[in-house]
C-alpha cells in the first residue's frame, strides 16, 4: 500500500536535531576563562622582557670584555707613562731658573682654573682668554655714531713681523709727540709694565736690557752735549772780553791840564 500523502509530508518536514552548544559546568565561572587569557598575555610579556634583559646583559658583557685590558697592556701603558715623566724631568733640567718659575706659574694657574671648573660646573672659564676685547673710542661730543672700534681694525691685529712694525710706526709718533708734557715721564713706566706683564720673565729681562742700553746711549749723548755746550760758552765769553777793549786813540794832552806847579805845593 503506497504511503499516504500525509506520511510523505511528515517525513519531509522532520529537520535534523540541533547541535547542542557547550554548556558551562556547574563549577565553572566566567572569571576563570578571563583569567586564563590574562595569564597567557602576561606570560608573553614576561618572555619579551626576559629576552630583552638577556640581550642587554650579553651586550654589556661583550663591551666589558672589549674594554678589559690584559696584564701586558697595563704594564705597557705604565711603562709609557713613566718614560713620559722621565722625559719631562730631563727637559726641566735643561731650562734655567727663570723659565722654571714661569712654567711653575703656568702650571699653578692651569691647576687653579681646572679646580674652578670643577667647582662651578661646565662654565667655560677660558672662552675669553686670548680674545681681543672691544675697544671703542668716542669723540669729544660723545656721539655714539662717531665711535670707532679700534679692535676691529686690521692694524691692531698684527701677526707677522711686518705687521708689528707697521703698528709701531703708527703708534710711536702719536705717543712720542706727547713726550714734552710733564705727565709723560710719569705715565710711561706704568704703560710699559702693562704692555709686558703677560710676557715670561725671560722676555721681560730682554725688554729691560734694551731699555738699559737705551739709557746708557742717552747718557753718552747728554754728556757729549754738555761738553759741547761748555766749550761754546767759554769761547763766547773770551770773544766778549776781547771785544770790550776800546780801540779809540787817546788824544788828550795831559801836560796842559790847567794846573800850575804851585797847585801841588
UniProtKB/Swiss-Prot annotation:
Residues 1-113, 215-237 are annotated as: Disordered. Residues 27-45, 86-97 have a biased composition (Acidic residues). Keywords: Coiled coil, Cytoplasm, Initiation factor, Protein biosynthesis. Residues 43-95 form a coiled coil. InterPro entries: eIF3-like_dom_sf, eIF3j. It is found in: Cytoplasm. One of its GO terms (cellular component) is eukaryotic 43S preinitiation complex. Residues 46-62, 98-113, 217-229 have a biased composition (Basic and acidic residues). It holds the Pfam family eIF3_subunit. It comes from the Eukaryota. One of its GO terms (molecular function) is translation initiation factor activity. GO terms for biological process: formation of cytoplasmic translation initiation complex. Component of the eukaryotic translation initiation factor 3 (eIF-3) complex, which is involved in protein synthesis of a specialized repertoire of mRNAs and, together with other initiation factors, stimulates binding of mRNA and methionyl-tRNAi to the 40S ribosome. The eIF-3 complex specifically targets and initiates translation of a subset of mRNAs involved in cell proliferation. Component of the eukaryotic translation initiation factor 3 (eIF-3) complex. Belongs to the eIF-3 subunit J family. PANTHER family: EUKARYOTIC TRANSLATION INITIATION FACTOR 3 SUBUNIT J. This is Eukaryotic translation initiation factor 3 subunit J.
Amino acid at each position: 500500500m503506497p504511503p499516504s500523502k500525509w506520511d510523505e509530508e511528515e517525513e519531509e518536514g522532520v529537520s535534523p536535531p540541533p547541535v547542542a552548544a557547550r554548556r558551562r559546568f556547574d563549577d565553572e565561572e566566567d572569571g576563570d576563562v578571563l583569567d586564563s587569557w590574562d595569564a597567557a598575555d602576561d606570560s608573553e610579556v614576561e618572555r619579551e622582557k626576559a629576552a630583552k634583559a638577556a640581550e642587554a646583559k650579553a651586550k654589556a658583557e661583550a663591551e666589558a670584555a672589549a674594554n678589559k685590558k690584559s696584564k701586558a697592556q697595563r704594564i705597557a701603558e705604565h711603562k709609557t707613562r713613566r718614560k713620559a715623566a722621565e722625559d719631562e724631568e730631563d727637559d726641566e733640567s735643561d731650562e734655567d731658573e727663570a723659565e722654571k718659575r714661569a712654567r711653575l706659574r703656568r702650571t699653578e694657574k692651569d691647576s687653579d682654573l681646572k679646580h674652578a671648573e670643577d667647582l662651578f660646573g661646565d662654565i667655560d672659564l677660558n672662552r675669553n682668554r686670548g680674545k681681543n676685547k672691544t675697544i671703542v673710542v668716542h669723540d669729544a661730543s660723545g656721539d655714539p655714531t662717531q665711535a670707532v672700534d679700534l679692535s676691529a681694525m686690521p692694524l691692531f691685529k698684527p701677526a707677522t713681523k711686518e705687521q708689528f712694525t707697521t703698528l709701531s710706526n703708527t703708534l710711536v709718533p702719536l705717543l712720542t709727540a706727547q713726550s714734552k708734557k710733564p705727565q709723560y715721564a710719569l705715565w710711561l713706566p706704568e704703560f710699559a709694565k702693562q704692555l709686558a706683564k703677560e710676557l715670561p720673565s725671560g722676555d721681560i729681562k730682554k725688554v729691560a736690557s734694551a731699555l738699559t742700553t737705551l739709557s746708557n746711549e742717552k747718557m753718552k749723548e747728554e754728556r757729549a752735549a754738555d761738553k759741547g755746550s761748555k766749550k761754546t760758552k767759554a769761547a763766547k765769553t773770551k770773544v766778549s772780553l776781547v771785544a770790550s777793549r776800546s780801540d779809540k786813540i787817546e788824544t788828550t794832552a795831559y801836560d796842559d791840564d790847567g794846573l800850575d806847579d804851585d797847585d801841588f805845593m
